[in-house]
UniProtKB/Swiss-Prot annotation:
Its cofactor is FMN. Pfam families: Dus. InterPro entries: Aldolase_TIM, DUS-like_FMN-bd, DUS_fam, DusA, tRNA_hU_synthase_CS. The active site is at C108. It catalyses: 5,6-dihydrouridine(20) in tRNA + NADP(+) = uridine(20) in tRNA + NADPH + H(+); 5,6-dihydrouridine(20) in tRNA + NAD(+) = uridine(20) in tRNA + NADH + H(+); 5,6-dihydrouridine(20a) in tRNA + NADP(+) = uridine(20a) in tRNA + NADPH + H(+); 5,6-dihydrouridine(20a) in tRNA + NAD(+) = uridine(20a) in tRNA + NADH + H(+). NCBIfam families: PRK11815.1, yjbN. The keyword Transcription does not apply. Its EC number is 1.3.1.-, 1.3.1.91. It is an enzyme of class 1 (oxidoreductase). This is tRNA-dihydrouridine(20/20a) synthase.
Amino acid sequence: MHEAQTFSSTPATKPQYPLQRFSVAPMLDWTDRHCRYFHRLLTKQALLYTEMVTTGAIIHGKADYLAYSEQDHPVALQLGGSDPQALAHCAKLAEQRGYNEINLNVGCPSDRVQNGRFGACLMGEADLVADCIKAMRDAVAIPVTVKTRIGIDQLDSYEFLCEFVQTVAERGECEIFTIHARKAWLSGLSPKENREVPPLDYERVYQLKRDFPALTIAINGGVKTLAEAKEHLKHLDGVMMGREAYQNPGILTQVDRELFDPNAPVVDSVKAIEALYPYIEQELSQGAYLGHITRHILGIFQGIPGARQWRRHLSENAHKPGAGVSVVEEALALVSPSYYESVGG
């Protein structure tokens, strides 16, 4: 059975790299607790984020929106909201539960988020963002960070970005920013289009780091390979990978060796799937549905013979009544025998 990883939020010695050196982005409907458990089997070092959770859901919701596995560490909670007191309250709850970081969403452009007065629209209210960050900083000892864009609508000059960062850094005492290297259109584009249509401007984020060298700055947007991540790390403190890490999670098996420690082992995907079995059995015994777990592992064998059969078997069988670990075992047997044998299957 896979043993839980442990990660201290207050290590005895200063870590070689910032916590944000490599992270998997918060992605709504994707980075739930099942996803994070699986990703942690693939990398010990990557910082994992929750889906965005609103302050209202945490304070008034019936579900436990702060639930996570102890194995998730290092793990960050992304909050959506704009009320400093509510954010401070939620940050304190999260710290008590053991989260390693609190992140404020100032980058999501969806209409639903805007109607709640949080997300990317807050870029136009730097003073309010600063108040929110300061309230959380005063409430907790763990890092409080911001994830934002390089601009919104017509407010897309480099000067605007600098003024926003400077205000939040000075008034809010925020030291860590993750910048999605695209502007956001608050109307006219869907959230999906806002991740694809506005052009990427990596150089603008590099310049931001040069102009604010004391800040920890990570980049997000369009990162598809670890080679690209390494290139960004020549200029910045961290890289956040989103859709590629989710749709092709095999990339995470290389993260620890490529970005943290050249002597770190590379996790093999077959053993990671097998290590997931006890978790699946435990979750199913508590009423979870297999499909809610297996949807996160569909892309693990991307590019390997048998990957299509693997995906098809899981997609067609995981939602059937009574589906259990045997469905995953059957799917794994469809992966190329030569690959399976090469990793000791």
